[in-house]
Amino acid sequence: KPIESGALKVNQSDLSFVKKFSNLVEKVDFFQFSLFKEPVAPLTASLIEKKKINYSQIVKNIKKLEKEYDLLVIEGAGGLRVPITKSKEIVDLIKSIN
């Protein structure tokens, strides 16, 4: 889950929960690139919390993970049309990583 909103702390994120019950040894921030407290769309959360979402870095990080793992399961945030930045939505992220 590269972008998550509605998590009070990193150790309370969805990814932390998955990591707890899996064999992953990497730190959560190795997989999770943007975490927000507000339980709203990523763009809205980033504006409220004044934290920029670096879309191109997220794509780059995911492509790096693709080289390290045989299989990636990537959870989005809401539906396909959920805004990530002012110009990018979840559907764009899917297209960017194929």
Please give the residue ranges for each predicted region.
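N-terminal phosphate/diphosphate-binding loop that engages ATP/GTP or pyrophosphate donors
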Residues: 1-52, 56, 61-64
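Structural motif
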Residues: 28-29, 70-72
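Conserved catalytic-core segment of NTP-binding enzymes
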Residues: 57, 64, 71, 76-98
